[in-house]
């Protein structure tokens, strides 16, 4: 038997109840995905003005599908500031909330 598809709701109808923001004590930064480099790596334009190469950890690889233009939270490496780990991906309603509150420019 085939699986029955359920109709998806329009993104604008979703209500945002809680949005995860970057935590300064963990050195987290907002970033926009510039390009996909392959092999679980992405090019990131961070909000602190640095272009970093991001790595998608194996625990989030299958659960978090990332495309160009997505807004994510990254943690820069302590050893190399030009590299970072992607730890969170925002949905469209969450991105709109971040823009309204002034987190994104």
UniProtKB/Swiss-Prot annotation:
Entry function: Seems to be required for maximal rate of protein biosynthesis. Enhances ribosome dissociation into subunits and stabilizes the binding of the initiator Met-tRNA(I) to 40 S ribosomal subunits.
Species for this entry: Methanosarcina acetivorans (strain ATCC 35395 / DSM 2834 / JCM 12185 / C2A)
Taxonomic path: Archaea, Methanobacteriati, Methanobacteriota, Stenosarchaea group, Methanomicrobia
Superkingdom assignment: Archaea
Keywords associated with the record: Initiation factor, Protein biosynthesis
Domain S1-like: 17-91
GO terms of molecular function: RNA binding; translation initiation factor activity
InterPro entries for the chain: NA-bd_OB-fold, RNA-binding_domain_S1_IF1, TIF_eIF-1A, TIF_eIF-1A_CS
Biological processes annotated in GO: translational initiation
Family: Belongs to the eIF-1A family.
Membrane-crossing residue ranges in chain numbering: none
Annotated spans, Disordered: 1-22
Protein name (Swiss-Prot/TrEMBL): Translation initiation factor 1A 2
Record flagged with keyword Ligase: no
GO terms under cellular component: cytoplasm
CDD domains listed in its UniProt record: S1_IF1A
A UniProt-annotated Pfam family: eIF-1a
